[in-house]
Amino acid sequence: MKLVVSCSSVQTIVDILDESEGENSISTLGQLRERIAADNDVDAETMKLLHRGKFLQGEADVSLSTINFKENDKIIVMGGKNAMADDAGFKMLMQYEKHNLSNLQKTYDVNLKDVADLERGFLEKPKQVEMGKKLEKKVKFFNEEAERHLETLDGMNIITDATPDNQAKRNREKRKTLINGIQTLLNQNDALLRRLEQYMSILNGDILE
């Protein structure tokens, strides 16, 4: 189940109660607070989480299955000092997310809209074919760009000998969150490419509608 977390002007997605994650699954209130704190550079002890007009309260071991969450529910983060603002590794990840990964999501959204527009069939067939070829290049280039971001994140030196263990854990979790987000976009983009290729096959007469 996905939750939309809003902190200041930034929104992130957190997957909860995902059995496929195994030991890394977020299933308790404490785990949810830790993930949100790591993703948003706030202090888990002082922040407050607002859900449907009420603050989420309870011990760390409270199961999230007992809370009335629904798909894409919104959680608003309030308070919480910048506990990790001075850590160079965490700051590096936050800056990379702000200046690169938000643009990656926007690029995917544009490609998704363009493919949907093409499928409506408002253009004459020759123009549809031309537009489809251009879109195919853009969608394939998205994969290349996303892979480069994965390589960059993997190569970042976010932990040094002087990094405290707790901070090192948070830095790793933050990088994992960013990588998981990119991999999700890659999976969605692969599905979009298959969808586009199928439509192009219909246009070219290889597949009958």
Swiss-Prot record:
Q: Which PROSITE patterns match?
A: BAG (PS51035), UBIQUITIN_2 (PS50053)
Domain Ubiquitin-like, chain residue ranges per copy: 7-84
Assigned keywords, A-Z? Chaperone
Keyword Flavoprotein belongs to the record: no
Q: Name one Pfam family in it.
A: ubiquitin
Q: Subunit arrangement? A: Homodimer or homotetramer.
Q: Its function?
A: May inhibit the chaperone activity of HSP70/HSC70 by promoting substrate release in an ATP-dependent manner.
Comment on protein domains: The BAG domain probably mediates direct interaction with HSP70.
Q: What is this protein called?
A: BAG family molecular chaperone regulator 1
